[in-house]
From Swiss-Prot:
Gene that produces this protein: rpsJ
Quaternary context: Part of the 30S ribosomal subunit.
InterPro entries for the chain: Ribosomal_uS10, Ribosomal_uS10_dom, Ribosomal_uS10_dom_sf
Short name of one Pfam family: Ribosomal_S10
Entry protein name: Small ribosomal subunit protein uS10
Organism of provenance: Alkalilimnicola ehrlichii (strain ATCC BAA-1101 / DSM 17681 / MLHE-1)
Amino acid sequence: MANQRIRIRLKAFDHRLIDQSAREIVETAKRTGAHVKGPIPLPVKKEKFTILISPHVNKDARDQYEIRTHKRLMDIIDPTDKTVDALMKLDLAAGVDVQIKLY
């Protein structure tokens, strides 16, 4: 797999889970002999929701909620076959979304 690159993008609501998963991926890739760039923190997406808490009147009574989506980006340069196998067998936390692309 010479001159190839694997780009891994992680998404999660909890920053501790995403950092732990990124550490595991970096350790696995380095252990198998690949070079890693990252993890690069991408901007946090904040979604805010405003909900009326009164069922009928009192428009002033509202609650606001916020969901933060944390993202990390990593590039694995010149991965070996061992690297790909180790990444496929890696068991990450349940709250982390992983997207893998080959370039």
